[in-house]
Amino acid sequence: MSTRARTVVAAAVLVSLAGAPSAGAAFDAGVAAGEVTSTTAKVWTRADRAGTVTVRIGTRASRLRRAGRAPARATHDDTVTIDLKRLKPDRRYFYRFVQGSQRSEVGRFRTAPRPSARKTIRFAWTGDADAQPATAGGPPFWNRFEVYGRMARERNAFNVNMGDTIYSDSEVGATHADGAFVPAAPPALTLADKWAKYRQNLGQAALRRLRASGAFFSHWDDHEFINDFSQAENGTELYAAGVQAFRDYAPVRYSSQDGLYRSFRWGRNLEVFFLDERSFRSAKATAGGVCNNPQTGAPDLAPTAPQATRNVFAALIPSFAQPVAPACLAAIGDPNRTMLGARQLDRFTRAIQRSKATFKVVMNEVPIQQFYALPYDRWEGYAAERTRLLTFLRDNVDNVIFLTTDDHANFVNDARLQTLEDGGPVDSGIVDITTGPAATKSFAKEIDDATGVADGGLLITRAFFKPAPPNGVGMTCASPDTFSYGQVQVTAQRLTVRLKDANGNAVVDAGTGQPCAPIVLDRE
């Protein structure tokens, strides 16, 4: 890491080179460097018109050389991604784009260390960000992406924007009718509409700063397409629009065969695996109405919870008094249903078993820990494959951890094979840490809406998520109403995760009222 003096000088050079805001007006969506390895990177920008865009790069901000060019085309909303090769490991690079007389701001990133290098790595992740205003022309409804701004100030080796990087169907003004999410505005279903959503989010300076500040990994979840997306339920046309829009605005490695599955090595201590949990999944178990609760006519809110547990909460949620249809439970447990698809599951399990990195981090779109509420879109809704995966990792791979977003909450727990079922808890020994959101409705407020009970989300957190089995699921941290992110530090002997709010402070546990303690994984 640079000394403080060198950092100040470098920052001053960046400011002077970037010039006044008007100097970069042609590149007003900013710049980004993605998929960074020890020798390669993908750099991104958006021009204001079609034509050739050139990228210049160097190890000093004051001396940038031409490194590649690509056309900005209207068919890709004038976005440009250029591959950089033959970079040096663990080296800081500066880059900027040029089109005619127009210059972008200067971005920067550091390449990954060599796989053999013993180096401490620090990174952060969050997701779930929506800049939709309440009224046209107004400010974003949720916030101005302060979480992203705080992440940029942390000077991490890299940052991860982990899913729901736009909201094709915004929760601003949305309602819940019979347990179903109903957006207030028409969803963005076309390519052009999705482009507009990405431009809307990039209108926030904090996100642009984060993308320009260092290596930036992007990943999708469902809202890049539509809520709870699967091709089986929502079709290939919507998938194609979502894929192109995402690739146009995020410098990522994608193929039709493997989707967004990929992995990156950051020195001897760390390998990061990104699972694609949208491209190949089966339809949810709710298809055909087999999980509809007879009292509400909508999908049951906790079909896999034991009936004894449901009875405890029936006063709060009367539909829990109704038994769950056996066909629903059979669908959830169907071994033929998949989250990852056979090819990806095989590639991932082989790769993580072969990995020579000390710690293996799995970037995970939806929680794999068990907490029963609304399980259909999560790993719990694909129970057989969840069990197979966790059993394999438990038996074959050391030092694994799941880092997750999607549920708009901070939830930390062992990804148990079972929790409240007959026979009692069975730990996997693998922790799942869920964080966020950056800027959308929190889990607590979503539960309020789904149940129609004021503060129902906090009540369920305190009465069920926090207590240890058999009275609850025993989360070690549960903060369901905080804009947040997670920061990870990896050394040769220890991986440490700290969950932080938009001010950089530890998130507060809703059960204890105290800051959530760091999560520590010591090397086995």
Regions found by a protein language model. Name each.
Residues 16-23:
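C-terminal segment of classical bacterial N-terminal signal peptides
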Residues 3-4, 17, 37:
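Residues at the start of alpha-helices and the adjacent loop-to-helix junctions
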